[in-house]
């Protein structure tokens, strides 16, 4: 057990997600399931690194992922409950600010608090990600991660998104476990 409950994998552009076939989504889902086994993980969230979708493209990507995983679609998210008891959630919105606006719009004004926003931003997961695995350059933070950056550890991997392997996520978990988490604290 590594203390990991929720891992977010951020990779690929919206164009790459559009071009990802049902078979490739099956493979990616299998790789993520394999990586989660044995470490106590309950949720994996996947989102694009950068880009945007038209409404028609968003629906196309969601349907392709749902067909590959047997998951259910709710707006911009496809959720798949794995046989091993954890949930994989694919959020097709690559714009963190837009995701925030969408979540805020979905809540009644009287219910908007930091807690309700956090819960809605990570739904179906109940917690902020412990670890974010970024498939992209280490000198640039993905625009999709506006909300998650405050309390999550980032690990950057060099593997191109569509070649994601369980070993990439397992190596990121290994890197995570050797870090001293300070949760925004600084040395005095």
What spans do the regions from the language model cover?
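Flexible, compositionally biased loop and terminal segments
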Residues: 1-188
């Amino acid at each position: 057990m590594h203390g990991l409950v929720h891992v977010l994998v951020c990779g690929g552009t919206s164009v790459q997600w559009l071009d990802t076939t049902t078979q490739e989504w099956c493979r990616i889902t299998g790789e993520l399931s394999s990586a989660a086994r044995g470490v106590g993980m309950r949720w994996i969230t996947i989102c694009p690194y950068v880009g945007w979708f038209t409404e028609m493209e968003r629906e196309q990507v969601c349907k392709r992922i749902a067909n590959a995983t047997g998951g259910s679609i709710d707006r911009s998210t496809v959720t798949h409950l794995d046989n091993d008891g954890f949930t994989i959630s694919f959020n097709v919105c690559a714009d963190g600010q837009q995701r925030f606006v969408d979540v805020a719009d979905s809540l009644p004004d009287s219910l908007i608090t930091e807690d309700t926003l956090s819960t809605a931003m990570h739904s179906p997961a109940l917690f902020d990600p412990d670890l974010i695995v970024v498939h992209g350059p280490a000198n640039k933070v993905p625009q999709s991660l506006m909300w998650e950056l405050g309390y999550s550890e980032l690990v950057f991997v060099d593997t191109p998104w569509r070649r994601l392997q369980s070993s990439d996520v397992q190596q990121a978990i290994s890197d995570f476990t050797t870090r001293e988490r300070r949760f925004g604290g600084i040395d005095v």
